[in-house]
């Protein structure tokens, strides 16, 4: 099986992409080939609806190319699952949205959960989107921000991890949650 993973951020270097490929390859069988790339132009990160709109057509081109090249599935490497409905309309291979997957797992595992996103500007947008889903509206307690932009998450991984633990602890104490969903794949 061959899976194409596309990060909807532009300008990522090959070393970073290879690191993601290695990380993801550890989670699949040895018979599965994972190929990770990013969009070649467009937004540097997905932090707004505008970023999603600009990245969407680029994702569509890449999904069509992946199907043409014989990939068995296409993964949009972003919690927002941007453009997955349009991608599914245009290709016959499965299109996977990690946000959908994470929220399905949270529904199964949790009584009450919190989504941790990157910046404060994403909180209300993410909350509104999640509250449109009948499954998440029952169990979503809150959406909280790290206040670290996507492009800076890996600048100081130790500091990001310390702050992430702090925000998670606050969500447990203040919101009574039992599960945390990371709302950015840059936190993986």
Regions found by a protein language model. Name each.
Residues 35-57, 151-156:
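N-terminal beta-loop-helix "entrance" segment that forms/cooperates
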Residues 9-13, 77-82, 119-122, 184-188:
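Gly/Ser/Thr-rich loops at beta-strand to alpha-helix junctions
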Residues 121-122, 129-183:
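Active-site rim beta-loop-alpha module in soluble metabolic enzymes
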Residues 48-65, 159-167:
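Glycine-rich, highly charged phosphate/nucleotide-binding loops
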């Amino acid at each position: 099986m061959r899976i194409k993973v596309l990060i909807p951020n532009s300008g990522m270097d090959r070393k970073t992409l290879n690191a993601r490929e290695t990380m993801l390859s550890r989670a699949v069988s040895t018979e599965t080939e994972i190929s990770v790339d990013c969009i070649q132009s467009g937004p540097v990160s997905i932090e707004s609806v505008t970023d999603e709109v600009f990245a969407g057509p680029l994702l569509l081109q890449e999904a069509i190319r992946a199907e043409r090249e014989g990939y068995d599935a296409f993964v949009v490497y972003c919690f927002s699952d941007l453009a997955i409905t349009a991608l599914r309309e245009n290709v016959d291979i499965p299109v996977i949205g990690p946000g959908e997957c994470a929220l399905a797992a949270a529904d199964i595992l949790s009584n009450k959960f919190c989504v941790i996103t990157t910046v404060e500007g994403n909180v209300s947008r993410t909350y509104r989107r999640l509250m449109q889903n009948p499954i998440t509206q029952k169990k979503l307690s809150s959406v909280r921000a790290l206040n670290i932009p996507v492009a800076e998450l890996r600048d100081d991984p130790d500091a990001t991890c310390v702050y992430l633990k702090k925000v998670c602890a606050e969500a447990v104490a203040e919101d009574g949650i039992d599960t945390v969903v990371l709302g950015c794949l840059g936190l993986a």
